[in-house]
Amino acid sequence: MTTSTSPAAMLLRRLRRLSWGSTAVQLFILTVVTFGLLAPLACHRLLHSYFYLRHWHLNQMSQDFLQQSLKEGEAALHYFEELPSANGSVPIVWQATPRPWLVITIITVDRQPGFHYVLQVVSQFHRLLQQCGPQCEGHQLFLCNVERSVSHFDAKLLSKYVPVANRYEGTEDDYGDDPSTNSFEKEKQDYVYCLESSLQTYNPDYVLMVEDDAIPEEQIFPVLEHLLRARFSEPHLQDALYLKLYHPERLQHYINPEPMRILEWVGVGMLLGPVLTWIYMRFACRPGFSWPVMLFFCLYSMGLVELVGRHYFLELRRLSPSLYSVVPASQCCTPAMLFPAPAARRTLTYLSQVYCHKGFGKDMALYSLLRAKGERAYVVEPNLVKHIGLFSSLRYNFHPSLL
């Protein structure tokens, strides 16, 4: 008499045969401990990790960020109030040159009082230019004030030290009477004005357009020097319309509709997989080489890097300017954009042909022009600026948050 054995019973019987020393059990335990215990404990406060506990930390981290920004804003204000000027009138923050190699144009509006965003940005650029020394003699700071009211205190203070272009100086304040011009179109027009003013005033080789809530990273000038003088001489990078220096960290994960990142992700697995396999085989005293084990560690490392956060692994590239990567740009966002002079003139023509509105801001307009005009654009990774503005100049935000 034969008795049938159920699939569940057969599975249990096979599981009982597995010993704690078997490869399958060890790798299963490693997976559970890594993704169920160690990684969540280590990463629950990392803002751009899948393990981040938003409900536990976000509100407090946002408040701490705002408080720190207030302190840094006050420090930047004192920095300029105490900054001496030669003969009491000659600016010392910038060194005038007949034709600068790079103009750094900072676009500013009157934002939330107390944070002094534009002062933070300009003071950081000033410090970095001083540290850079003779290598940055061809760099020119330029402030573009697009605030319609005359109450922009920070812009007035900076005018003692930095050349300023005021879009609405000496004009009638009748902008609000035109119902066809919304805030998104105005932002685009402001951008066009500042880019055009930079070209007309200095005729530089490059224009770096920086919004007044984008603080430069410490490595920005050595990296730009390397990129523009070495990397952008490569044929596939020549004649680019623009180079983005910032992409939101929350959009830097591998699981994104960008093919280049998928290739990079697979490359991470192919690099770390064999290394982890060798370590496992050595310490587990396993003879020979196992393709299934290597495949496991390839997938294991890919999953770990994605869940911890690609953003944090990109930070390793800051070890050297040559390690920064340049990849095709996506549509969001425009805190810092570098334009070669010929491309900047093409951009002015392109932007004059589009109209911006809610859902189609200047960043989307610039990105849409790439395909329409057959242009190319790139983004540098990791970011070369930090976005510190939680208060948008386009949207009211009474409860700002880091995410």
UniProtKB/Swiss-Prot annotation:
Residues 1-22, 286-287 are cytoplasmic. GO terms for molecular function: glycosyltransferase activity. Glycosylated. Its EC number is 2.4.1.-. A motif (DXD motif) lies at residues 211-213. It is a multi-pass membrane protein. It is an enzyme of class 2 (transferase). Residues 44-264, 309-403 are lumenal. CDD domains: PGAP4 (cd22190). Its main location: Golgi. The keyword Disulfide bond applies. Disulfide bonds join C132-C136, C144-C194, C332-C333. One of its GO terms (cellular component) is Golgi membrane. GO terms for biological process: GPI anchor biosynthetic process. The chain crosses the membrane at residues 23-43, 265-285, 288-308. It is found in: Golgi apparatus membrane. Contains three transmembrane domains, including a tandem transmembrane domain insertion into its glycosyltransferase-A fold. Transmembrane domain 1 functions as a signal for Golgi targeting. The conserved DXD motif is involved in enzyme activity. Golgi-resident glycosylphosphatidylinositol (GPI)-N-acetylgalactosamine transferase that catalyzes the N-acetyl-beta-D-galactosamine transfer from an UDP-N-acetyl-alpha-D-galactosamine to the 4-OH-position of first mannose of the glycosylphosphatidylinositol (GPI) of a GPI-anchored protein (GPI-AP). This modification occurs after the fatty acid remodeling step of the GPI-anchor maturation. Belongs to the PGAP4 family. This is GPI-N-acetylgalactosamine transferase PGAP4. It comes from Rattus norvegicus. The lineage of its organism: Eukaryota, Metazoa, Chordata, Craniata, Vertebrata.
